[in-house]
């Protein structure tokens, strides 16, 4: 078995054994779904947003998710407080820059988080990563209309600028720390028929980052498992609604051995 695949399977086994708490400061649209995905992969979710409690809550967490999908000034303050405390504790922070490039507020907030905090992984679509990297990309609402001309260059530039891992997700997922590159080829087109699947993917990345300090591999592991679950779910589904149910079932039922055998992760950008 490929060593990367074996490590991905081992990560899932550690998640299931340790049940890390994943602290989300996330958007109102996906809160219930990402909480359930956290449970199904093997972690424990908490959605704590108030500035008075986030520093205390994140002290118990294995990872922190910052998702800017439904922004407000109070939530931005909470993200910065929680992120700084997570950095003090060396707890990984995973950023989902929902809609970056669509409005000045979203772009400005994401850049502030990247400059103010030590972000372990940025997980975004082509439009979002293109906008934040300066390589170009168009976002309509929160959906990517067009990505950068060279997605790998955009991901590398963002990773190098902010000393982070960037996971650019799409038909294939490109993951880089600015030097190393992994490509995940798992996934299914039906993921585009549901709201919040990108946010669910971010939650999967955070769960893997909670047990693996090589965040490049952690991001690949979370995305490979999520994509594999989608592939298997599509075999049982008849449309978006049944696909969502099957997706959650597959995330819950997949074993470390199945994930290790089914992950399609290659080194390099192709």
Curated annotation (Swiss-Prot):
InterPro entries in UniProt: Hyethyz_kinase (IPR000417), Ribokinase-like (IPR029056)
The UniProt record lists the keyword NAD: no
Keyword annotations of the record: ATP-binding, Kinase, Magnesium, Metal-binding, Nucleotide-binding, Thiamine biosynthesis, Transferase
Enzyme class: transferase
CDD domains cross-referenced by the UniProt entry: THZ_kinase (cd01170)
Residues binding substrate, per UniProt: 47, 196
GO biological process: thiamine biosynthetic process; thiamine diphosphate biosynthetic process
Binding-site residues for ATP, renumbered to this chain: 123, 169
NCBIfam families: PRK09355.1, thiM
Primary role: Catalyzes the phosphorylation of the hydroxyl group of 4-methyl-5-beta-hydroxyethylthiazole (THZ).
Family affiliation: Belongs to the Thz kinase family.
Protein name: Hydroxyethylthiazole kinase
Gene (UniProt): thiM
């Amino acid at each position: 078995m490929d060593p990367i695949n074996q490590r991905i399977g081992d990560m899932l086994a550690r998640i299931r054994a340790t049940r890390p708490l994943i602290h989300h400061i996330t958007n109102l649209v996906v809160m219930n779904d990402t909480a359930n995905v956290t449970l199904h992969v093997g972690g424990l979710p908490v959605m704590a947003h108030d500035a008075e409690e986030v520093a205390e809550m994140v002290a118990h967490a294995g990872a922190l998710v910052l998702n800017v999908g439904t922004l407000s000034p109070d939530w931005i303050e909470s993200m910065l407080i929680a992120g700084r405390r997570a950095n003090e504790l060396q707890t990984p922070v995973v950023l989902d820059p929902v809609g970056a490039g669509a409005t000045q507020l979203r772009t400005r907030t994401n850049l502030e988080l990247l400059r103010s905090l030590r972000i372990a992984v940025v997980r975004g679509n082509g439009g979002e990563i293109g906008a934040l990297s300066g390589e170009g990309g168009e976002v309509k609402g929160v959906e990517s209309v067009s990505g950068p001309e060279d997605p790998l260059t955009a991901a590398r530039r963002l990773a190098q600028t902010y000393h982070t891992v960037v996971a650019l997700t799409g038909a294939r997922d490109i993951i880089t720390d600015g030097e190393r590159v992994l490509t995940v080829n798992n996934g299914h087109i039906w993921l585009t028929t549901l709201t919040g699947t990108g946010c669910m993917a971010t939650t999967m990345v955070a769960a893997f980052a909670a047990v693996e300090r090589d965040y490049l591999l952690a991001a690949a592991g979370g995305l490979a498992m999520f994509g594999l679950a989608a592939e298997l779910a599509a075999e049982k589904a008849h449309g978006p609604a049944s696909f969502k149910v099957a997706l959650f079932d597959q995330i819950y039922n997949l074993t470390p051995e199945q994930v290790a055998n089914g992950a399609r992760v290659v080194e390099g950008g192709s």
